[in-house]
């Protein structure tokens, strides 16, 4: 069973992609989800409550849309997943998290998201479903 208390932030400039990621998370049992369409929104949402999100799921396209240093997303989340990471420069790691940090090139699929969330939330049991995927 998914931990219903996990706070998750999805950051993607494309609203339809954010909705697809949210749908994947819902299928895994997660519903405390916020979305951001820019890095500024992600930073504000991640820092305004005084405690970071448990998980940040962010598009590599969004990250390269603004100049940033390696600490620009510090304090936003405890764990992070970057999908479409092929857009990031080699060796550049914008995630400064204490927990799990994962980079995925290309589309985000349910199996990949389930594997990442299993590292973040080890007590959860995830169905082995296929079919939903994000496409660049």
Across the structure, where does each feature detected by a protein language model lie?
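Phosphate-coordination loops involved in phosphoryl transfer and adenosine-cofactor binding
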Residues: 3-5
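Two-component/phosphorelay signaling modules centered on CheY-like receiver
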Residues: 15-34
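Conserved acidic carboxylate
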Residues: 11-12
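Alpha4 helix (beta4-alpha4-beta5 surface) of REC/receiver domains from two-component response regulators
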Residues: 65-69, 76-105
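Acidic, metal-coordinating helix/loop segments flanking the phosphotransfer/catalytic sites
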Residues: 37-55
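Active-site residues of response regulator receiver
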Residues: 57-61
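CheY-like receiver
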Residues: 108-136
């Amino acid at each position: 069973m998914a931990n219903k208390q996990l706070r998750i932030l999805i950051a993607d400039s494309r609203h339809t992609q954010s909705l697809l990621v949210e749908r994947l998370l819902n299928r895994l049992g997660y519903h405390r989800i916020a979305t951001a369409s820019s890095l500024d929104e992600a930073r504000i949402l991640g820092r305004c409550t005084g405690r970071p999100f448990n998980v940040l799921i962010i598009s590599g396209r969004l990250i390269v849309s603004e100049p940033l240093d390696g600490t620009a997303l510090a304090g936003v989340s405890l764990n992070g997943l970057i999908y479409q990471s092929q857009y990031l420069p080699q060796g550049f790691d914008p995630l400064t998290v204490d927990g799990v940090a994962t980079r995925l090139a290309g589309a985000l699929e349910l199996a990949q998201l389930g594997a990442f969330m299993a590292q973040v939330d080890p007590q959860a049991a995830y169905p082995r479903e296929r079919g939903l995927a994000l496409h660049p």
